[in-house]
Amino acid sequence: MRGFAGQPLKGIALTFGDRTVRGEAMVAAYGLEGGAVYALSAPLRDAIAAEGSAVVAFDLRPDMTAGALTARLSHGKPGQSLSNHLRKALKLSPVETNLLREAHGKDLPTGPGALAHAIKAAPIRLTGVQGLARAISSAGGVRLDALDENLMLKSHPGVFVAGEMLDWEAPTGGYLLQATFATGLAAARGVQAFLATPPPR
């Protein structure tokens, strides 16, 4: 897959365990990234830590049933390469075809039904996560039960926390920014309230 670094996988669905997310992924030199991968990052990270790896199923055509894919794949021209057949029948890009080969081996099934099922559930094994230096957002931080309602540390009165200082699975993009701004505002109001409260005598 490294030869396809920087190329997107658009309009896909990823399934891990009982959770399925739709979105995009990007092939990187070190593996996979992107919104759909980030949405599953917490359970994937935990599974990799516990088991050493995690298998994610890629559905490259989530808007089509296996039956619809089978019907389209049944009309190939004799002598046509499998890559060309997939491109013409389903508009599969070279990076998507390569992902199929990565998942199912170089010799993909040639029967329309088996090939359709391979496209609907391409298993990719993940063996690690990127380090904190490359993180867009991170997990871990100050536990919520260590804080009062103003985001002040119960053990250190006058110390307030916000944003990614908190222990929560932060989403990426605008959601993370909004949550950071909101908790920052809540902490600032907590600071004001703390400073306005006379110290105990």
What are these regions (language model features)?
Residues T183, A187:
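A glycine-rich phosphate/pyrophosphate-binding beta-strand-loop-alpha-helix module
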Residues M165:
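Active-site metal-binding loops of divalent metal-dependent hydrolases
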Residues F4-A5, A13-A162, P171-G173, Q178, ...:
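Residue-level recognition of phosphate/Mg2+-coordinating polar/acidic sites
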